[in-house]
Amino acid sequence: MITAYDLFAQNGIKSVSMDDIARSMGISKRTIYEFYTDKEDLLCRGIVYTYNRFKKLLSTYESESETVIEAILGFYHELIKHPKCYNKKFYADLKRYPRAMEIESLYKSEFSETCRRLFDRGVKEGVFLSEINFELVTLIANKHINMLEPSKAFSSH
C-alpha cells in the first residue's frame, strides 16, 4: 500500500496502473487484488496511512515544543522533506475518486482544527495577533500545500 501511494503521489494517480504497482512491488496483480478491491481502495488506505502519520507527527511537535512557533516550524520542516506529498497531478487526479476525496476532505478538516488550536495557542503566547483572520490564513496554507513544488521552491535551502 505504501509503495502504491508513493507512486500515486510522485506520478499522479491516473498515470499509475495496477501493473506498475505490482511490478514495483515485485508481486503479481492478483496478489494485490487479494488484499485491495481496486485502485481507489489502495489510494484511500494510502491517504489514511499518510495522514495518520503526519497527524501523529504534528501532535508530537504540538505537545513537545516549548513554543507554538517551534511546533509549526518543526512540522513544516518535516512536510518539506516529503516532496512527493505535493504533486499537483496527484491532487488533480484525486477528484476522480469520490471516496478518496471524502477521506482527504475529512483529514483536511481535522488538520484545520489542529491549526486553529495552534493559532489559539500562539495568541495566548503573544506570538500571533488575535485580530488575524484565521480562516483566511488556513485557506492560504492549504492552497500553498496543494500548489507547492518543494523541489523547485526549496532547492536553495
Language-model segments: what does each one mean?
Residues 53, 82-86, 118, 122, ...:
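A short secondary-structure junction motif
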Residues 45, 56-85, 138-141:
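Hydrophobic alpha-helical connector segments
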Residues 10-13, 63, 129:
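Helix-turn-helix/winged-helix DNA-binding modules
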Residues 80-117, 136:
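Short secondary-structure transition hinges
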Residues 109-144, 155-156:
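Hydrophobic alpha-helical bundle segments that form small-molecule/ligand-binding pockets
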Residues 3-7, 78:
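Short amphipathic alpha-helical elements of helix-turn-helix/winged-helix folds
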Residues 7-41, 45:
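Helix-turn-helix
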Residues 1-4, 21, 46-50, 54, ...:
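Generic hydrophobic, amphipathic alpha-helix propensity
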